[in-house]
Design a protein with these regions (language model features):
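Bimodal "functional hotspot" detector
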Residues: 24-56, 162, 223-377
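Bacterial N-terminal signal peptides that target proteins for export
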Residues: 2-10
Length: 377
């Protein structure tokens, strides 16, 4: 082979090699995306997504209805057993329920305290509290002042979600610290909302179950003493029992005799109606009734002046067929009974909103009568 032929052959082979190499390179290299996008694949049904589910359960499914967490249950007594203090055991009973208020009495080993909750769409707060209250008045109607205005608490505030916090007039700070907490009580196991309230050196954990209300309280004082109160009994169709001392004429109509009786009042029952029945003999507690069956008590309440106010129907005078001595004893028996019920010394007794005035006794406008036990045998 001559030299030109050899060069021609080499040139053809070299060009073929370049073409083959170029073809192979084009087939092996993938195109490069200059701006890659990360693809997130949604979890398949059944895959574990615990964090997301817990977030949904604890926020989106929590009721925002205040009545779900602090319900108004008529004629229902709640009893709480406890450890760590003699005051850990107590009972609550709803005395009066209005559209936006709940008045209830809490009874423990030491005292009876009446509290009023006010409900709005966004919160439940205390608006009234009075310790040492052994009688029943509808304080929303009578307007009696709260004895501890600077100690009132906000119970719950929307939105109901973990992390929500608020400050109460008492100075305490409350926070929703957990939800769907499993809480065991003598009445059963509940899924509860946990609210932590702190004030000075005391921390309270309050647990509320939907539809039931407060089921448990755990109080930690100075990090040393733990006081626990747990719901131990729910009694429906119950009545509140309030003891009262009645004063009636003795058999000779010369003095007054004390008789112990008990009022049984349900939710929204005013005390005046049952007191009327006690005094007119309908209940059988009095041997000699003070009132006739025609007499009605128009109103009865304790005023901010610490005077018991009572107004009778006109039959109190019209049916008073007695001499001056017996009439005086009968009126004194009313004053002693009503004054004792409210634990006050003065009673303002009126008839149809006018001063009591009969042929034997005539009171002046605004004149009160004093509780007097000197004629009690």
């Amino acid at each position: 082979m001559n030299q030109p032929t050899i060069l021609k052959t080499v040139s053809v082979l070299t060009l073929s090699g370049f073409l083959l190499a170029a073809c192979n390179t084009a087939q092996e290299q993938e195109p490069v995306d200059p701006d890659p996008i990360e693809t997130v694949t949604a979890p398949e049904p059944g895959e574990d997504d615990t964090d997301t589910e817990e977030t949904i359960d604890e926020t989106d499914t929590l009721s925002q209805n205040m009545l779900d967490w602090l319900p108004m249950n008529e004629d229902t007594a709640y009893t709480y057993s406890g450890t760590g203090s003699e005051f850990a055991e107590y009972q609550t009973y709803p005395q009066f329920i209005h559209n936006d208020t709940l008045q209830f009495v809490e009874t423990n080993a030491s005292t009876e305290t009446v509290t009023i909750y006010e409900y709005t769409e966004n919160e439940v707060r205390e608006v009234f509290t009075r310790a040492e209250t052994y009688f029943r008045d509808d304080f929303v109607d009578t307007g009696l002042n709260s004895s501890e205005q600077d100690q009132l608490e906000i119970l719950l505030q929307a939105p109901v979600e973990i992390g929500r916090s608020w400050e109460s007039p008492s100075g305490s700070v409350s926070e929703i610290t957990d939800a769907n907490v499993e809480v065991e009580t003598p009445t059963g196991t509940y899924s509860a909302l946990e609210i932590t309230r702190t004030l000075n050196d005391q921390s309270d954990k309050l647990y509320y179950a939907k539809g039931t209300g407060l089921i448990q309280t755990i109080s930690d004082v100075d990090g040393e003493a733990e006081i626990v109160s747990s719901l131990s009994n729910i009694q429906e169709d119950a009545a509140e029992e309030i003891p009262i001392t009645l004063y009636e004429l003795n058999e000779m109509a010369t003095a007054l005799t004390p008789t112990n009786a008990t009022m049984e009042l349900r939710t929204n029952d005013p005390a005046r109606l049952q007191l009327t029945e006690l005094l007119n003999g309908s209940t059988g507690d009095m041997t000699i009734p003070t009132l006739t069956e025609n007499v009605e008590i128009n109103y009865l309440y304790l005023g901010n002046d610490q005077i018991a106010h009572v107004d009778f129907s006109e039959e109190l005078i019209n049916d008073m067929n007695a001499g001056s001595g017996i009439e005086a004893l009968l009126i004194q028996s009313l004053v002693n009974t009503i004054g004792g019920f409210y634990e006050v010394d003065e009673v303002l007794l009126t008839v149809e909103e006018a001063p009591y005035a009969s042929g034997h006794i005539a009171l002046e406008e605004g004149q009160t009568m004093s509780v007097d036990l000197s004629n009690v045998e």
